[in-house]
Amino acid sequence: MIGLSHYLTVAAILFTLGVLGIFINRKNVIVILMCVELILLAVNINLVAFSTHLGDIVGQVFALFVLTVAAAEAAIGLAILVVFFRNRGSIAVEDVNMMKG
């Protein structure tokens, strides 16, 4: 049977991969957004695992809210990247830092 420790291990691995991906690849904005989504996925796995372990549904409901916010964040982030790419011709992080504002 798959226990709580298995879910926590998978979530810890996903969280670590997301954080390492952000620190290792600082040049591509799309990869950074994907790593943030990976971190949010690890958080959701923890929420659902603890929710089922404790027999409470609040963690699962909160995971749905996190999924909704993550989807909105990804959509807005990609829309901003498309507009930025059309204006600058590049999506490198160095170019984003040079924006006025």
Curated annotation (Swiss-Prot):
Catalytic activity as recorded in UniProt: a quinone + NADH + 5 H(+)(in) = a quinol + NAD(+) + 4 H(+)(out)
InterPro entries, per the entry: NADH_UbQ_OxRdtase_chain4L/K (IPR001133), NUOK/Mnh_C1-like (IPR039428)
Superkingdom of origin: Bacteria
Keywords from the UniProt entry: Cell inner membrane, Cell membrane, Membrane, NAD, Quinone, Translocase, Transmembrane, Transmembrane helix, Transport, Ubiquinone
Signal peptide positions on this chain: none
Segments passing through the bilayer: 4-24, 30-50, 65-85
BP GO annotations: ATP synthesis coupled electron transport
EC number: 7.1.1.-
Main location: membrane
UniProt subunit comment: NDH-1 is composed of 14 different subunits. Subunits NuoA, H, J, K, L, M, N constitute the membrane sector of the complex.
Similarity comment: family membership: Belongs to the complex I subunit 4L family.
Function: NDH-1 shuttles electrons from NADH, via FMN and iron-sulfur (Fe-S) centers, to quinones in the respiratory chain. The immediate electron acceptor for the enzyme in this species is believed to be ubiquinone. Couples the redox reaction to proton translocation (for every two electrons transferred, four hydrogen ions are translocated across the cytoplasmic membrane), and thus conserves the redox energy in a proton gradient.
The protein's name: NADH-quinone oxidoreductase subunit K
Gene: nuoK
